[in-house]
Amino acid sequence: MDAPFAKTPSNLLIAGVDEAGRGPLAGPVITAAVILNPEIIIEGLADSKKLSLKKREELYEKIITNCKAFAIARADVEEIDRLNIFRATLLAMQRAINQLSIQPDKVLIDGHCCPDLPYETQAIVQGDQNVPAISAASILAKVTRDREMLKYDAQYPDYGFAIHKGYGTKAHLAAIHRFGITPVHRKSFEPVRQLKLFIPEE
């Protein structure tokens, strides 16, 4: 697992990009772009979904402290409902890359598709497992989104956002059917769009 992370080309500024939150029924999609410092190897980078909460938090601090540049962006629920999740994710990726304090020579994106960018771009399937900069981006995006879902949990305590982070678990679906939907639910997603009950925004 360590081999793919051993070396990074030192003559190019490579930005890795990933997202967190495409699948949930609630909350934003968060994206991150990271340009790592090739002179500082961050041990333990991996797909954020395969790391413990404690490890993600530790790596988050190491990444933002030691990288050359990073940016975190988002597409809100309203944008997801208006554009669809695919287009909203690409928009959030564009925002993250455009917010970098350093212009990259190349952008590597986890997945199958790339947003429209003025840089050389490449989509890499399972890039979060094999490309250090993408792994770093996945960690920043995941930690940022999880922290936001904790805030939603405090605002809407009946839904268990702190536990499932907005994904369609049995407990989350049961809460939706019992209490209706909140302003942070994605109204274009099933089964949310089947429901007409809205909790007024406070």
From Swiss-Prot:
Residues 12-201 form the RNase H type-2 domain. It comes from the Bacteria. A divalent metal cation binds at residues 18-19, 110. Pfam families: RNase_HII. GO terms for cellular component: cytoplasm; ribonuclease H2 complex. It catalyses: Endonucleolytic cleavage to 5'-phosphomonoester. Its EC number is 3.1.26.4. It is found in: Cytoplasm. Manganese or magnesium. Binds 1 divalent metal ion per monomer in the absence of substrate. May bind a second metal ion after substrate binding. One of its GO terms (molecular function) is RNA-DNA hybrid ribonuclease activity. Its main location: cytoplasm. Its cofactor is Mn(2+); Mg(2+). Endonuclease that specifically degrades the RNA of RNA-DNA hybrids. Belongs to the RNase HII family. This is Ribonuclease HII. The gene is rnhB.
